[in-house]
Amino acid sequence: MGRGQIIMILVGLLCLANESYSDVIAKSSLQMCENTGNSDDPYNVVDQKACEKKLIVTLSVRSGQNGTEFLKAVTNVSKVYDQTEKEMARLYNPFIITLAKTPVKLTYPYYYLAMVNNKPTERVVISDSKWHASGSYHACSDAWDDEDALCGFYTDAEGKPIWDSQGFCCRCTEQEKWRGSFNDKNPYSRAGINCKLFGTQAAAHCMTFDDLWYTVNEVGLWQMDFSIHVKAYDLVVEKVGNKTQSKWVDGGEIVIGPTIRSGVGVHGRLHATFIGEFQSHKQFPVLTTKYLLIPYVSEKVDPKTHPQFRNGPHDYMLIDKHEVNYKSSGPHECDKIGVSFSAFRAQAPMGCSQKQGDCLHNQPKDYFEEDTKRRASGKTPYYFPQKFGKLLGVNQRKDNNHFVLTYEVDEVMTSMVTLQISADDVILIYNRAEGKILRAYAQDFEALSRDGNLYVIVQNIGLVTADFYVVIKECSVGIGKLLEKAASINPQQTHSFTFSVKAQQWKGGDNFCIVQLYDARRKMVDSSNVTFRTTEPCVCASSCGCSCFKNGFKCTKREDRDFTKTKPKDSGLDLGFFPKLWNKIKNVWDTVTSVFNFMESGWALLGTALGLLSLGGLKAFLGFRKTGSRIARFGFGGANKGRVRRRDGSGRMVTMEFNETGDRIDPETKEVIEPRNKKKELLLNLFFFFILPFLLIYHLVGWIRWRMRKPGSEDEEQAGTGDEQGGASPLHNIEARAAVDQFLQPDTIVYHSYSQDDYVAQFLINPGKRFCMAGRMTSLSGPSADQFRFDLLQAIQIYEVIDNKRRRLESVNSLNAHYFSRLLNAEAMIDCLSLKPAFPCLNVNRKRKPKQK
């Protein structure tokens, strides 16, 4: 084999979580020298010491191997023993190449999305109504943006109230009050309020937040992270004085892997290339369907003392995405992480019959406490990262500053590496040591669960670091197969192997497994028998409870009842309106009594009297002013203007006319026949608010009497008026009949008065506040002689009213005469018709100064 010859060496690296192999395929001969630890020089093969020699095709290099295996390449060694020719050969400049692979890690990048609260809770506020409110419906307010809302409002960063943060109110219905007062079974109340007659309790249910918050993070796809370290050592001979000394000089290190796939040594004698990774027989966990929840450090939470920060990343939680609602836009659902104010408030009214805290279950704190109990009892957690493998922690990537969740791979992985070295021969030195099983045991666990673990403690009793393999050779029926595990153990040190045991049958009982220990040469050095017991699984089914069983699942049956398949017929007496009526009466009574209770104080009574007198004086003052007459006439008092229908001293309805100052005048001569009594009006208005309640009662009694009057009573009152129509006529005296007759004279023009609020005003252009339209009256034939119709004299609008002055329109406004036609009786004619226009007339040219009413 010529000097400087370039050969290709393919190295396949097989690794467990902390172990790796390298398979070397080369043309050079490989010699394996067994190092038993009795020599100070681990490379005694160079000094021609005795060793076992054979051709090596594969070489294992385990990550974290601590130098148990070396790939030693020698070029131009001075002496080499040729097994074929049975003689020594001379070689020069030997060198050593070592390969090592770090533990394989899976990194899961995660990205921040939102914040959710650790444990929203429900706060209940019980309230009784005050003097100004009666009944439980007034004791609690949950209206939006109501400053008196019993729960108050949460506000955002801008200080604006958050929608639905006011919670909801629960009150006693009238049926519940009746049932509570008569010792009937009262329905469950969420707040436990006391529902009885005259009771005023109500409860506000408010959602509040815990001091601890969690960040919600999106988890990305996993990436494999490891590195392969290749080192070269050159043997250099130096002459010091009269002595020749040799030493190994570090020729540099090449680090390759998924990120840096190739490299060259310092002296260029070694070139390493990472080809790729073989696929594992087992799929790695995919966490893209879950959110990573990380507790958030704030001023209100001390991470040194808070229990949910105690174990760092080991207490983070991986929750299914469908269990988290972090978006404020919805959907708003109860009993999910990130429950919103809208979801909590949407419980009403049915939520009042639910338990306190309903809608606020399945929060991060609940998941944390559940997994903490499982971990303390030796069971596999549901949500902690431990469920998916051995968690190493959270690291930060150097390339993009992203944080990644890091797991250690517990599976055999294979990497392919190509080495190009200038060499003639490769010598393999292989460490081997004796070992023994100190203890092998398994804890009892529940069948069909993932809580079984088998532990094997191994000790290296040799003098060098060596590899050991633990194989679970055989187990009882129903126990799943367990994968082989391996580790490099330092001299006189121990290592603990953990295997996950699964029982794949319902039936519990005694079980066993045989544990075997092998050394680096695959020679069995020790074995042990492990016994353990599995229990029947305990299953919890909805509405059936929990039970541990042996012969399959059974659910408790419901007691047979005679269920009604069709809607039952209505029966019995429904008195549901009584509670409503009683509630209204009680509310009025409570209000009245609260007013009287307030009036018990002498100062309050004096202040109220002065206030009522002041209001009466204001009413009288406005009555004496021209613009305030309407206010003063409310109730009684105040100036009357124009024509007014009222009863005279004999009780008959007559039409009275008043001038601008409120004095009564004669309709024909316009002379004052009854001056206005201002002193009387002033006195009545001063005490008006004192007698207002009695005045209202008086009018109420009069209205009731009018409603209860028999149909014939009006006819009897009208007897003797000369009306032969049997009482259908509303005319009560000769004066009224004469006025009606004037309106019905042939060719007589009458004027119909309107206001801007009347229906016909919408068809006119700027009619003003009060106006009139000229027309004629027609007597209609029928069962009653007092039926008349008003029709427009001409269906056009000639004038408009601007600033209380009549002005001619630029063009005539055509009108629909049908809208202005109106059927009138005698009383209506007297009220709205006149022979002279009282207000500006809009459809005739007659000019007359209008009278302002």
Curated annotation (Swiss-Prot):
One annotated Gene Ontology cellular component of this protein: plasma membrane
Sequence ranges on the Cytoplasmic membrane side: 625-853
Extracellular side: 23-603
Residues annotated as signal peptide: 1-22
Glycosylation sites: N529
Tissue expression notes: Detected in sperm (at protein level). Detected in testis seminal ducts.
One of the GO BP terms on file: single fertilization
Further remark: HAP2/GCS1 family members mediate membrane fusion between gametes in a broad range of eukaryotes, ranging from algae and higher plants to protozoans and cnidaria, suggesting they are derived from an ancestral gamete fusogen. They function similar to viral fusogens, by inserting part of their extracellular domain into the lipid bilayer of an adjoining cell.
Family label: Belongs to the HAP2/GCS1 family.
Protein's name in the database: Hapless 2
Organism the protein comes from: Nematostella vectensis (Starlet sea anemone)
Gene: HAP2
